[in-house]
């Protein structure tokens, strides 16, 4: 068989130290898992009840359109309706479907370091991945992104807040970036961590996506909603973009369990907000501990903190964190903000 040449440099998305992570997930191996930016709480009671009610219907295919989920998303984002909503098997599928819409050949720009899946998605679709370095302060520089745009640029992906740094751009900065981009370049805002942003100048991008013909937002239920195991995400965009994204979406990609759990969770927005506020308070506590210990860290707006120290420091205290090496930060650790007891272990590791 002859394989596509552009697949040669790609490798499967595989978290490092997978065997240790699996042991931590099972509660064996004596380790607490704070590697993957997951929520330490399970689904909301409303989501659990919806799952129990839906279980007898598991012999039937789910709603292909995920209408109830789209309605819940639209209701949570003023100014949008179901025709503006994208759904997918995690926000990763939403991102992939958006990139499937652009012309090829061409290139995709994104800041770097950022979410490591972007180069793989671009490569599988036959698009070249171009990395634009972050500043020395670990921030995205919009001017650098704009300077990197060429006639071959088809899309720009902005992880905001950025993973693994937790730094962010304000709505004003994002709007200015969208204004300056050529109209035929798609700006994708990956907002997986948007619920954890404390800066009021950040919020409101969904309106930007509804107003602009070349802007789309991708979000997930894997973080603040605590539904990572169900693989469900959503997006917001113009009716035209949403229509084309639905044309390329794999049928039934959002299963029954994911649909009902995500719908119930989205409808309980006040409880999700309370969870996010807890994470923000705990993040501030962990950052304060890093500061008092004299460690260099990046002030974060996500549910994680990037700190300049070896993962071994935390592992000795029974905490498994993400190694910075594969994330573009050798010698650093990315620490997920967990529950109070888990964060106590992180702080206790500092001595």
From Swiss-Prot:
Its cofactor is pyridoxal 5'-phosphate. Pathway: Amino-acid biosynthesis; L-histidine biosynthesis; L-histidine from 5-phospho-alpha-D-ribose 1-diphosphate: step 7/9. Pfam families: Aminotran_1_2. It is an enzyme of class 2 (transferase). The modification N6-(pyridoxal phosphate)lysine is found at residue 223. It comes from the Bacteria. GO terms for biological process: L-histidine biosynthetic process. The keyword Heme does not apply. Keywords: Amino-acid biosynthesis, Aminotransferase, Histidine biosynthesis, Pyridoxal phosphate, Transferase. Residues 1-26 are annotated as: Disordered. InterPro entries: Aminotransferase_I/II_large, HisP_aminotrans, HistidinolP_aminotransfase, PyrdxlP-dep_Trfase, PyrdxlP-dep_Trfase_major, PyrdxlP-dep_Trfase_small. Its EC number is 2.6.1.9. HAMAP family: HisC_aminotrans_2 (MF_01023). Homodimer. Belongs to the class-II pyridoxal-phosphate-dependent aminotransferase family. Histidinol-phosphate aminotransferase subfamily. This is Histidinol-phosphate aminotransferase. It comes from Rubrobacter xylanophilus (strain DSM 9941 / JCM 11954 / NBRC 16129 / PRD-1).
């Amino acid at each position: 068989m002859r394989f596509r040449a552009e697949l040669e440099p790609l490798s499967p998305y595989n978290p490092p130290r997978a065997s240790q992570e699996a042991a931590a997930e099972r509660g064996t191996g004596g380790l607490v898992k704070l590697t993957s930016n997951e929520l330490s709480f399970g689904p909301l009671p409303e989501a659990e009840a919806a799952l129990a009610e839906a279980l007898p219907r598991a012999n039937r295919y789910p709603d292909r359109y995920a209408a109830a989920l789209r309605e819940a998303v639209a209701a949570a984002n003023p100014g949008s309706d179901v025709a503006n909503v994208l759904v997918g098997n995690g926000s990763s599928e939403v991102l992939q479907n958006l990139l499937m819409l652009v012309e090829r050949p061409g290139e995709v720009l994104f800041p770097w370091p950022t979410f490591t899946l972007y180069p793989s998605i671009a490569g599988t679709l036959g698009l070249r991945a171009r990395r634009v370095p972050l500043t020395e302060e670990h921030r995205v520089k919009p001017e650098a992104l704009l300077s990197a745009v060429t006639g071959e640029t088809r899309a720009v992906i902005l992880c905001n807040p950025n993973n693994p740094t937790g730094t962010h751009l304000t709505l004003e900065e994002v709007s200015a970036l969208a204004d300056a981009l050529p109209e035929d370049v798609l700006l994708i805002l990956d907002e997986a961590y948007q619920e954890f942003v404390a800066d009021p100048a950040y919020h409101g991008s969904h309106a930007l996506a509804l107003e602009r013909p070349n802007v789309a937002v991708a979000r997930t239920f894997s973080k603040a909603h605590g539904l990572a195991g169900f693989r469900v995400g959503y997006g917001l965009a113009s009716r035209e973009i949403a229509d084309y994204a639905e044309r390329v979406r794999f049928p039934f990609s959002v299963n029954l369990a994911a649909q009902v759990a995500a719908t119930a969770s989205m409808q309980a927005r006040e409880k999700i907000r309370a969870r996010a506020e807890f994470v923000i308070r705990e993040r501030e506590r962990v950052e304060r501990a890093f500061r008092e210990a004299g460690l260099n860290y990046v002030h974060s707006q996500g549910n994680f903190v990037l700190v300049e120290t070896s993962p071994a420091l935390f592992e000795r205290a029974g905490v498994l964190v993400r190694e910075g090496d594969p994330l573009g930060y050798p010698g650093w650790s990315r620490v997920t903000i967990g529950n109070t007891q888990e964060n106590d272990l992180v702080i206790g590791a500092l001595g």
